Amino acid sequence: MAKDRNAVTCNGRAAFYAAMWDDIRQCAMDCGWAVALHGSLASDMDIMAMPWVYEACSFENLVKEIVKLFNGNSIAENYRISYGEKSHGRIVATIPIWADFYLDISSMTDCN
């Protein structure tokens, strides 16, 4: 028996975030960082970032490079990236990318 069409659903947010994942991953690798996904992608895209090579850029520069993927070749002065601290010394950058779609990038170090 075929599935009822109403039973087949797609999380549109997950599909939206999945479409940009490879660009984010490659950007992080170019900056000397490794990234991994965490969470359901139901509301935002939670990314765990860790410096992977000795020459990795700072966390702030990684975030700026990722923002360039959505904002062209330069960071807009009014682009709102908010930084915060979480438990166990974790730092997080929240990047609004469109409407209520966000990237939350977390790291245990700022790699200065």
Listing of model-derived features with the role each one plays in the protein:
Residues M1-S43, M50-N112:
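Catalytic core of pol beta-like nucleotidyltransferases
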